[in-house]
């Protein structure tokens, strides 16, 4: 089949970009589909994840809307982006003649009802509605999508007007090594350094309990707009000896094995890819029960500790408990390894191929 992925931008270093490119590569290289990725926005940044030679990549070179202008100019800028994107996307689709188009993120939701053509239109939801900017556009998209694919059952229940909603979770690659030393007094947190990930409250909770785990260290991997602010928070909290911002890692999947506990403080997620990555390495997680996905991966007391969203006192207690018990870390980590088979690349790509077979 001829397949197109439409996404606003593919140059980011986040989990969504990694998953989209990974799926496109697998569908082309392993299942022999004809795959094209269309990226709307122009960018000087390199693509962070390798695109298979069998996958065609097209940039529409649309300049993002300016926001440093008055309200009237902002409306003009948004209309310019919409019309340019629509015209250039239609031109590409006329040339490709795809059998199915996957639309991703907000710009994808906006484009889906207007691109026309006979191709099946599939929207991929990578975030809860409450955490999706301008999510009202998704309501119009529901009326036109042939299928909406979500990562979790919770997110699926938010789409009540689409005729076909399916749940296909993310997959994670198998790390080259797993956790061996559960006695290591090292904690890890991973994600883009922006407000939704809640790293500010993680640092605050680490400070509140530092006397109870003075011999532990916390490494936070990721880049983003809050980097300077978080660094200043670490300094002002006198945590420079125990908390480090490690920046971006191009091989994060193999970092988890160097730690004995994973901490996740997100306010919201599409699924929480880092939970799957930690699980694949046999690393137990302490996580808030965010919408959506935490409870799909972590069963409280079995393979990690699940804390009611925003209950920082309970999170601090859970964090200290697992850091004080090597036995719990080992037991929960080994259970994570047993459960990780649910999210292998082979099993998840099979679900995508079954969806495409329904259209053939």
Which role fits each region the language model picked out?
Residues 5-13, 26-76:
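N-terminal strand-loop element at the rim of the active site
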Residues 14-22, 185, 189-214, 225-231, ...:
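A conserved mid-protein helix/loop that constitutes part of the nucleotide-sugar donor-binding site
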Residues 85, 102-109:
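Short His-centered aromatic/hydrophobic patch
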Residues 126, 130, 143-177:
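Donor nucleotide-sugar binding/catalytic pocket of nucleotide-sugar-dependent glycosyltransferases
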Residues 231-247:
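Nucleotide-activated donor-binding/catalytic signature segment of Leloir-type glycosyltransferases, i.e.
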Residues 248, 267:
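Aromatic "clamp/platform" in nucleotide-sugar-dependent glycosyltransferases that forms part
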Residues 284-288:
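Short hydrophobic beta-strand element within catalytic cores of glycosyltransferases
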Residues 299-301, 305-312, 321-326:
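Conserved acidic donor-binding segment of nucleotide-sugar-dependent glycosyltransferases
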């Amino acid at each position: 089949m001829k397949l197109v992925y439409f996404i606003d931008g593919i140059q980011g270093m986040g989990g969504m970009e990694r998953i989209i490119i990974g799926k496109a590569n697998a569908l082309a290289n392993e299942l022999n589909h004809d795959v094209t990725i269309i990226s709307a926005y122009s960018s000087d940044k390199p693509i962070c994840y390798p695109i298979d030679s069998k996958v065609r990549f097209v940039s529409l070179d649309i300049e993002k809307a300016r926001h440093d202008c008055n309200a009237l100019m902002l409306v003009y800028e948004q209309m310019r982006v919409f019309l340019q994107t629509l015209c250039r996307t239609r031109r590409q689709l006329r040339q490709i003649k795809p059998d199915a188009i996957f639309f991703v993120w907000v710009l994808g939701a906006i484009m889906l009802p207007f691109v026309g053509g006979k191709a099946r239109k599939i929207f991929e939801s990578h975030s809860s509605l409450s955490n999706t900017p301008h999510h009202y556009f998704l309501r119009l998209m529901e009326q036109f999508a042939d299928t909406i694919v979500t990562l979790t059952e919770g997110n699926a229940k938010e789409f009540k007007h689409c005729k076909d909603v399916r749940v296909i979770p993310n997959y994670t690659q198998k790390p080259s090594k797993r956790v061996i030393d559960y006695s290591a007094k090292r904690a890890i947190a991973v994600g883009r350094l922006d407000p939704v990930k809640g790293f500010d409250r993680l640092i605050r909770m680490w400070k509140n309990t530092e006397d109870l785990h003075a011999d532990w260290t916390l490494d936070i991997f990721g880049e983003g707009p809050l980097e300077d602010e978080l660094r200043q928070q670490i300094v002002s909290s006198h945590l420079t000896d125990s908390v480090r911002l490690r920046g971006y890692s191009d091989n994060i999947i193999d970092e988890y094995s160097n730690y004995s506990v994973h901490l996740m403080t997100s306010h919201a997620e599409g699924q929480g890819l880092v939970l799957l990555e930690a699980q694949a390495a046999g690393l137990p997680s302490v996580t808030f029960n965010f919408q959506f996905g935490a409870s799909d991966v972590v069963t409280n007391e079995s393979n990690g500790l699940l804390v009611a969203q925003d209950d920082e006192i309970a999170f601090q207690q859970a964090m200290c408990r697992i850091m004080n018990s090597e036995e719990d870390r080992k037991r929960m980590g080994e259970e994570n390894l047993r459960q990780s088979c649910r999210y292998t690349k082979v099993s998840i790509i099979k679900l995508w191929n079954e969806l495409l077979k329904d259209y053939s």
